[in-house]
Amino acid sequence: STTKGEQLKSFMPSDAKFTYEIVKELSTPNSFDEALTKHNDIEYLFHTASPLTFDTEDPENVILQPAIKGTENILHAAADHCPNLKRVVLTSSDAAIYSNTDETNPTLSFNEGSWNNTSYQDALKDNITAYYASKAFAEKLAWEFVLMQKPVFGLVVVNPSWVFGPKAYDFDPKRFNSSNEMIDDLLKLNHENNSTFENVSGGYISATDIAKIQVYAIESDDLVNKRLLMTNGYFTCQQILDIINKHFPELNLP
């Protein structure tokens, strides 16, 4: 949005080489064509845009299709309009590697060839399943695009686990991304109601570490055609609650 673009611009030095373009709907056909035609001299492209909310009654059109079509649209636009492009860095997720059901399996093992094989029909059952599956569908599409279309650019995929960390700018507290949405939901817990996320656990990664690997992905030729699973450790929601209670005991969370 213009508001977000101007907000980011305000953080930059006056002589910074920063501009922004607005892509209103990721899933609209040719949604990135105008922006990439205007900036067809770029050499590196980061695709980090994907729905990050579990608060919807329409997972297909809010979560699945924007993730899949957004990836398809930006890759086609990049191949068609950016002849000097050297590399695309796609931010996927560990959710592309295993399903939300698999993640709760204590004996789970995986490697760079592992995939979340949730079917499209099963992905429509609930928002969390849809989110996990959307990452797999979008990433598989990206690898298939590179294999079949053989574009001039190389592809690197970053697969972070749950991302926690400070935001670089002020934001609407009614529109959290999924990681912050979980923490906000836990903050509203009392001893009588439940949280959508209270049984969630998984790997986590610092937002600043994700930023570092994004840069490394364009600097290192060794990472082309690689999937990079990113994690700092493992968390449970109870650990988050324990940290909150330690620093804010007046909240008296369960």
Place the predicted regions along the sequence by residue.
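Glycine/proline-rich active-site loop of Rossmann-fold NAD(P)-dependent oxidoreductases
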Residues: 151-152, 165-181, 217-227
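A conserved pocket-lining segment of Rossmann-fold NAD(P)-dependent short-chain dehydrogenase/reductase
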Residues: 120-126, 166, 173-205
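NAD(P)H-binding glycine-rich loop region in Rossmannoid oxidoreductase-like domains
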Residues: 2-69, 79
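Conserved Rossmann-fold NAD(P)-dependent oxidoreductase catalytic core, especially the SDR/UDP-sugar
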Residues: 47, 57, 62, 66-126
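Conserved sequence/active-site signature of Rossmann-fold short-chain dehydrogenase/reductase
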Residues: 96-97, 163-165, 210
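Mid/C-terminal beta-alpha module of Rossmann-like enzyme folds, strongest
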Residues: 199-204, 211-254
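Active-site Tyr-X1-5-Lys
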Residues: 117-156
